[in-house]
Regions:
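Acidic, metal/ion-coordinating pockets
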Residues: 1-205
Length: 205
């Protein structure tokens, strides 16, 4: 773990030295089918945020995990997507009979982060993070797969109409909303630096 973490931190340093305005990390970590990040994921995320990462995306557990906003040592707000689930996969209720969390393997997300940058300084002044939840549908012969956005148009989705799986998609949306919260689906705005860091800067000035 420490060897991998040291290498990633070195990559962050190299990116900054090369003039990168924004550093994005994408991690392959965590335990399969676990819906909560483990202590290693949490430790690594905070370490990378402190080292200079601006956004952290991740996958591998094959199920969704929570999102978070970390505060780095220098006061930046750093969005973390601990696991983005399965975007497209054959892992599902029908194919994983022995896995307790099998239905959650059908769920995924499109993670969206919008950045507002001060052109004169390159400083990130605002970030918005949100999630578009998705569900993998499988139906037909020959087998067809469809990525279904779990949104207001779900009831009229062509794939769900063909498969008859609307109720499963609706259940998936309930699962995702309970895990991530409605605010994350709508969008969370945050300043580039945390409110506490901003107060400290003003006091120092």
């Amino acid at each position: 773990l420490d060897t991998d973490l040291e290498k990633i931190c070195g990559d962050i340093d190299s990116a900054r030295e090369a003039g990168a305005d924004i550093v994005v990390c994408y991690l392959h970590w965590g335990s399969e089918y676990q819906r909560e990040p483990d202590e290693n994921q949490i430790y690594m995320a905070q370490t990378l945020a402190d080292r200079g990462a601006d956004i952290i995306f991740a996958s591998h557990p094959h199920v969704l995990q929570k999102t978070d906003i970390l505060t780095s040592e220098d006061g930046r707000n750093v969005p973390v997507f601990y696991s983005m689930g399965n975007f497209i996969s054959n892992q599902r209720t029908e194919t994983l009979p022995s896995i307790a969390n099998k239905r959650y393997t059908e769920q995924g997300m499109i993670a969206v982060v919008d950045l507002s940058v001060m052109k004169s300084t390159g400083e990130i002044i605002e970030k918005t993070m949100r999630v578009i939840p998705t569900w993998v549908d499988r139906y037909g012969s020959p087998t067809k797969y469809a990525i279904v956005p779990l949104d207001a148009d779900m009831n009229s989705n062509a794939a769900l109409n063909a498969s008859g799986h609307l109720s499963r998609a609706q259940e998936a949306l309930q699962d995702v909303t309970a895990l991530l919260g409605e605010d994350c689906l709508k969008g969370i705005n945050m300043p580039g630096i945390s409110a506490d860091a901003e107060k400290s800067e003003k006091k120092a000035a």
